[in-house]
């Protein structure tokens, strides 16, 4: 409601950046597409709460405040491995647009409902992940994905040195994001070291 009121009254925040979308490599279409992914992420949060009130959803920790992750998804290739914080729905949505035949909104709703048809967890837990999107499943256990990201990044450089097949590109990048609570966790500290 607040965003609609702000747009209608044109009382939007003052932009402190002198860069235009074109100057950072974004077309108008890409900018609108990113915004759409962010809105979809936010509406999934709303829908999860509606489903929870109806007794149809069992996980309502949303991705509000993390919508900017959609831009990260656009910055990386869809086959760069991404180890995601459990609030990174906007990233998953944006990446799904880069890979044909994805049903990510439906899949995420199945996850919220703990449906056995959920393609990533089979109804065991709300999980962000997708094999076709190169996003290993990650639950809300904080920082547990950081060592996996380090190992995956190491495997890319190692695959260039030894004759071994790797599903990741030789010039691949491993992306990992996490929340502030993770940064003080011993698992994260081990990954940093």
Please state what every model-predicted region is.
Residues 1-69, 75-76:
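Conserved acidic/glycine
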Residues 43-46, 53-193:
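Cofactor-binding active-site loop characterized by glycine-rich and histidine/acidic residues
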